[in-house]
């Protein structure tokens, strides 16, 4: 089954990625992806786009050739307080806010520090999805994070790239996260974390973990465009109302 939604992609605006929005649209058409989010790295990363890049995402059309585009960011969790590198009224202009740990911004520390930072980001109300929480470089209290995610309605990502090109050794942590999410009622989402358009919608490794723990697929945000849009609307993203009529034939 091809899941029709991808929440995590990077364009040439993050200079260690290699595809344009046009490239992603072309691959989306080929693969049957109906909705994807463009989520370049937050401005605290050395090669991230300027702050204005995210402000001006409003110029992107809502849909091109039947493919919807979400305007987003993969922000950086900066400190133990869970602060991220995108803020203020600008956050409300985005459709989706991802956030995670990245070594150049928040060097790995200890389990207690990582857990506190991640839970504070979850509690902040500013973050919709925590990216690659299974990164072995950042050990966390998985049950505590999953419980917070369930309580505050934040999704946890099973990052497909973590099993292929980066964050080697993530399998055990991601399996534990999926199990905890199932037991505690947290929402999961699969992210390709594409840095080149060819991997858009590539979820094979992430899906194998989700299936191994028997996580309910009717809770996966990738299951349909409306499932994700409803989730984002419930989290206060009024901007996604523009997209909802375009998927009026969709079953959440």
From Swiss-Prot:
InterPro entries: Phosphatase_YcdX_put, PHP_dom, PHP_phosphatase, Pol/His_phosphatase_N, Pol/histidinol_Pase-like
Gene Ontology terms: biological process: bacterial-type flagellum-dependent swarming motility
EC annotation from Swiss-Prot or TrEMBL: 3.1.3.-
Assigned GO CC terms: cytosol
Keywords, alphabetical: Hydrolase, Metal-binding, Zinc
Bound cofactor: record note: Binds 3 Zn(2+) ions per subunit.
Annotated signal peptide: none
Domain of life: Bacteria
Protein family (similarity comment): Belongs to the PHP family.
Protein name stated in the entry: Probable phosphatase Shewmr4_2619
UniProt source species: Shewanella sp. (strain MR-4)
Lineage: Bacteria, Pseudomonadati, Pseudomonadota, Gammaproteobacteria, Alteromonadales
